[in-house]
Amino acid sequence: MPRSLKKGPFVDAHLFAKVEAAVASNSRKPIKTWSRRSMILPDFVGLTISVHNGRNHVPVIVTEHMVGHKLGEFAPTRTYRGHGVDKKSKR
């Protein structure tokens, strides 16, 4: 279910502080975060945010189409290697 409009978007305070500092200094350095639950705000557009996927940090370049989504949606946590091959059908 979506979050209530009355509550507004959720962004971790430490992440928002890093984003504000990066925007103020016009920094191109990626922002490293573990906060997959934070929502992408219009202030994040154009920044590179490294989102942790459980093993390493995945760089995410934020575009206008990502606003309103969560950071974790763009850093997949599972790798799909395909289903097992049927050996009978090869004959």
From Swiss-Prot:
- List UniProt keywords, sorted A-Z: Ribonucleoprotein, Ribosomal protein, RNA-binding, rRNA-binding
Q: Read off the Pfam families from this record.
A: Ribosomal_S19
GO biological process, any:
translation
Q: Name one GO molecular function term.
A: rRNA binding
Name the GO cellular-component terms. Answer: cytoplasm; small ribosomal subunit
Lineage, top-rank taxon, reads Bacteria
- NCBIfam families in the record: rpsS_bact (TIGR01050)
Q: Tell me, what does this protein do in biology?
A: Protein S19 forms a complex with S13 that binds strongly to the 16S ribosomal RNA.
Say which family it is in: Belongs to the universal ribosomal protein uS19 family.
- Protein name, as recorded: Small ribosomal subunit protein uS19
- Gene name per UniProt: rpsS
